[in-house]
């Protein structure tokens, strides 16, 4: 019999329901979590046995959105969901980052978490629901998971923090921050902001962590009622004698190797030391496992770096704790791109370009929460050569998607509004060298490239990555961390912003016990580093260029009456297609009558504007137009007078004498002056060549009526 166990609780303005025991009973654990009609089904499966030769923790987190959740059928030929979207990939990373550090070191059994969105309320984002579900399922599973964790979204509206704001509230919010943590400590922060202060950002983190305690309490209560027995897993006993033997052979040599400042040279020396140590020990005892020896050597490396930092000694590359690596900033490095920059910080380098396009180039995104259009695109590429390796080159991986989104968040707050700068902007960051914080180098490079492209960004932005080494109550915050310091440290803390405030904050913490005080020190130290980098960047370019690149399309905007849109588009788009071909421009029309003409040539744009004005101009009775004969009939001729408008010249209005045959006076395609006599209620236009000719020949004007009377 199905026997569901349910917990309900109020979480801010939402009601959260946790339900287990009803579905997926063959999985290690399964939970259905709902928050006001947004429901996510999360399963966990853990393998009891490890794979032979396994030396890492194979945790996989999959997040998948089903279109039926929003009452939709998927697009595409197959009409079913395909590979994960960028949004799904980012949420999978959001779930993974806070749960991964809560598994004990040495646990290498395969674990898979699958979160499936099965119902969605357009006002409630499924990401927080999925994170709560993953925490609950892992806690119920009996796996050696040191959770549960809670998660919360924090907004900032009217100078007040808002817990789990709705999608509509987020549009008014100056902050979109997601925080996750255990009962005692914050583990992860992901955010974008409209240039808020360090204190405001820290306040949001603390607020979110305090509010999510109710989630942790309810998951604990659910585990008491429905949790599976804890796995009887113990880490392998430490071989103290072997550890001492490895340390005797390698500790001093590894410590010296970490004084080599050049990354490639240092890595080469470390590889030699490790290989020689393992070879020596295996020669002494063939039963020793090379993987086990590698793990011991890694622990010695980690301890060597950390102990030196805590002792106040210089870092791996000789810097003090708050020093920034040498900077080299260049703009306009690529001649035919719309904007470009090369940003180098030590051994990290990014070649960043900015490209301007029209609204037609914007990305249309079909999401579960609703369709939207994105006119600011940010793509981050991390080729293997950037770290001196070979590897596969192809579609972006999870890490590249995540880093690209973080860099985009760093720049988004300073981008101009669409009505002031109606371009689609694409920024691409090519990481050409990497030794720590390439995503923050991308933020700096993007700011420079956008200014070089003439994009009127509100301020320059820069990013910096901070690190932490902590033992007991002793801690040191490091500015501008290297790759090794990231890998061997306890925290990766990335901050982007302008001189005014923070635009993006990302934090991943590998240990418990990160206090508000430590975060405050890190934020203040990051501010000093950010201002230093901005100072160097401003020496290269301190304001957007006065004009966009000569190779970029120039967008000219005019306004027409919405009633005239159909005239410019024409039947089946015939008029606008002809206009595009005739003028060599790109023309886009919005529902409110805004017309955007994009052209790399100013004369072509002026021509297109003139043609549109002709098409949309109201026909004035009594005005003389230059027309072209389009059709000849027995009773007269039809003449086009521009703007797709046509009128009839009756046979009696062709000349000031009797006309027997229209073709005696007019030919197809002939250009003639015509005067508008009348526009009737149905929009039909009566024209006269006779009266137009009389008005354009003043000398003959008095005689023509007299001659006509004489006849």
Swiss-Prot record:
GO terms for biological process: mRNA catabolic process; RNA processing. Residues 553-612 form the KH domain. Its EC number is 2.7.7.8. It holds the Pfam family RNase_PH. SUPFAM superfamilies: Eukaryotic type KH-domain (KH-domain type I), Nucleic acid-binding proteins, Ribonuclease PH domain 2-like, Ribosomal protein S5 domain 2-like. Mg(2+) binds at residues 486, 492. Residues 690-711 are annotated as: Disordered. Residues 622-690 form the S1 motif domain. It catalyses: RNA(n+1) + phosphate = RNA(n) + a ribonucleoside 5'-diphosphate. GO terms for molecular function: 3'-5'-RNA exonuclease activity; magnesium ion binding; polyribonucleotide nucleotidyltransferase activity; RNA binding. GO terms for cellular component: cytosol. Residues 694-711 have a biased composition (Low complexity). It is found in: Cytoplasm. Component of the RNA degradosome, which is a multiprotein complex involved in RNA processing and mRNA degradation. PANTHER family: POLYRIBONUCLEOTIDE NUCLEOTIDYLTRANSFERASE (PTHR11252), POLYRIBONUCLEOTIDE NUCLEOTIDYLTRANSFERASE 1, MITOCHONDRIAL (PTHR11252:SF0). Involved in mRNA degradation. Catalyzes the phosphorolysis of single-stranded polyribonucleotides processively in the 3'- to 5'-direction. Belongs to the polyribonucleotide nucleotidyltransferase family. This is Polyribonucleotide nucleotidyltransferase. It comes from Enterobacter sp. (strain 638).
